[in-house]
Amino acid sequence: MELLEGSRRSDAMAVLRDACENWGFFELLNHGISHEPNEQSETVNKEHYREHYRRFREQRFKEFAAKTLDSGENVDGDNLDWESTFFLRHLPTSNISQVPDLDEDCGSTMKEFALGLEKLAERLLDLLCENLGLEKGYLKRVFCGGSDGLPTFGTKVSNYPPCPKPELIKGLRAHTDAGGIILLFQDDTVSGLQLLKDEEWIDVPPMRHSIVVNIGDQLEVITNGKYKSVMHRVVAQTNGNRMSIASFYNPGSDAVIFPAPELVEKEAAEKKKETYPKFVFEDYMKLYVRQKFEAKEPRFEAMKTMDAVISSQPIPTA
């Protein structure tokens, strides 16, 4: 990120553009998020799992999995994930104080952690605007275009314990992310994350203090396909306990999502592809929860039927 402040800014922006257009993923170093709250959040979340979730959820999960994986019979690996998770919501309202067994230290650490990530996500959105030729702040205004004027922002903490038979089950099945821009701190010692590029699965290796960023479905729609969300998955490992902390900066639930008119006009002049649909983000999410592990294209097609019932709403400029 420090390259954006110096003489190599144009080179850094070109790398960012290529990553968004051709990969849907990129990795940030020197991103401005202090290592201390990141390391604290990792520590407290590991302690939280050890003291609470591993005692209940993970134990029940392992007991269930053992019945199938040990025998190798009746395993429906297409409908199972070797993953234990909990979720924290930051915006529009926080639920941290309501999360069971989440102690005060963990909660305050995660609040500080989330505040820095929220600012970083908004900075990244402005960099995307610059590369796209959109007005600064455009993407944030779209995301905040709902009735409360706020985005949806939350964090998913995932734990992937050692798996006795990883050939039978994924840590997390292949999917694209439904929302906007995703910032991931992945485990810096245990690997597993892969992305799909040209029909080939490519490892995203652990790198200490880096943030893996990926494009969600909503940015694909807003950019009218110029930037793509990409299938990714987590491969279960026989050794090591993998933890990841993923923060999702998404549109508000009733925000209306549609291709940026400026991009559509430009592509129309160049006689390029048809436009993506227009829809309310919450409606897309209702479909996504049923089809998360399926291809995204049918979801976009299904949303086209809703175009006629959504009125055009100008995005505020202030």
Swiss-Prot record:
Pathway: Alkene biosynthesis; ethylene biosynthesis via S-adenosyl-L-methionine; ethylene from S-adenosyl-L-methionine: step 2/2
UniProt cross-references to Pfam families, sorted A to Z: 2OG-FeII_Oxy, DIOX_N
MF term (GO), any: L-ascorbic acid binding
Ranges for domain Fe2OG dioxygenase: 151-251
Binding residue positions for Fe cation: H175, D177, H232
Source taxon at top rank: Eukaryota
Keyword vocabulary terms for this entry: Ethylene biosynthesis, Fruit ripening, Iron, Metal-binding, Oxidoreductase, Vitamin C
A Gene Ontology biological process term: ethylene biosynthetic process
Enzyme class: oxidoreductase
InterPro entries: DIOX_N, IPNS-like_FE2OG_OXY, IPNS-like_sf, Oxoglu/Fe-dep_dioxygenase_dom, Plant_2OG-oxidoreductases
Substrates-to-products reaction catalysed: 1-aminocyclopropane-1-carboxylate + L-ascorbate + O2 = ethene + L-dehydroascorbate + hydrogen cyanide + CO2 + 2 H2O
EC number: 1.14.17.4
Keyword Metal-binding applies: yes
Cofactor list: Fe cation
Similarity section: Belongs to the iron/ascorbate-dependent oxidoreductase family.
UniProt protein name: 1-aminocyclopropane-1-carboxylate oxidase
The encoding gene: ACO
